[in-house]
């Protein structure tokens, strides 16, 4: 296991930056590896506030040419003022987390021989440990051809119960549909940032509907 192609740890992650990453270029997941409750923090590369729009400011080319001429003339402050007032595009929107897949297992959190690892050759993340006679193992990976994150649960010398749930910080609802757990929701239509002062103010504007999303 202690091979250079593995990342491995002897305890679960306690914060997001310690979790193991998997992804396929579109879907991503961060795996914490707790014994009694596995959390996979999900994201999607297109889940942003706002909606498609042209961010190029009208007259920006002329403003750039004027600012460049002022800079070449040594008038740097005037050049900077024009860049800030007439050249810069609108503020970008906010990238959002999709939510959490939570797997709750039966039994206690007592364990031995715990290993949490990521195989850098196969991109498979795994969690394994012993609970009495049971040997528990989870394998997770993100498939690019199938566009899914897959979870495989294995138990040797026994059996187990698991409950799956989906959580999200956005406006959403979760329902069971055709054997699937489906989460659907809506992101804010705008995320405005006022960067003109030392203390930035943030507001959500929902005059237009934001992006709709579904996760199953």
PLM segments and residue spans:
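Aromatic-residue-lined binding/catalytic grooves and analogous aromatic/hydrophobic interfacial grooves
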Residues: 1-216
């Amino acid at each position: 296991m202690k091979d250079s192609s593995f990342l491995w740890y002897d305890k679960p992650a306690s914060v997001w930056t310690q979790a193991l990453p998997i992804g396929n270029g579109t879907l991503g997941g961060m795996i914490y590896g707790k014994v009694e409750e596995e959390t996979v923090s999900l994201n999607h590369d297109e889940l942003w506030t706002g909606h498609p729009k042209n961010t190029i400011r009208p007259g920006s080319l002329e403003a750039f040419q004027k600012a460049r001429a002022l800079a070449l003339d040594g008038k740097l402050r005037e050049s900077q003022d024009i860049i800030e007032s007439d050249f810069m595009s609108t503020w970008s929107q906010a990238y959002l987390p999709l939510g959490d897949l939570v797997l709750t297992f039966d039994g206690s959190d007592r364990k031995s021989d715990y290993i949490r690892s990521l195989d850098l050759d196969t991109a498979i993340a795994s969690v394994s440990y012993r609970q009495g006679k049971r040997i528990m193992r989870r394998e997770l990976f993100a498939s690019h051809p199938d566009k899914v994150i897959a979870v495989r649960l294995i138990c040797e010398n026994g059996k187990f119960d698991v409950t799956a749930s989906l959580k999200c910080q956005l406006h959403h609802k979760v329902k069971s549909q055709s054997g699937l757990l489906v989460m659907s929701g809506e992101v804010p239509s705008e995320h405005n940032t006022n960067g003109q002062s030392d203390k930035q103010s943030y507001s959500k504007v929902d005059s237009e509907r934001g992006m709709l999303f579904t996760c199953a």
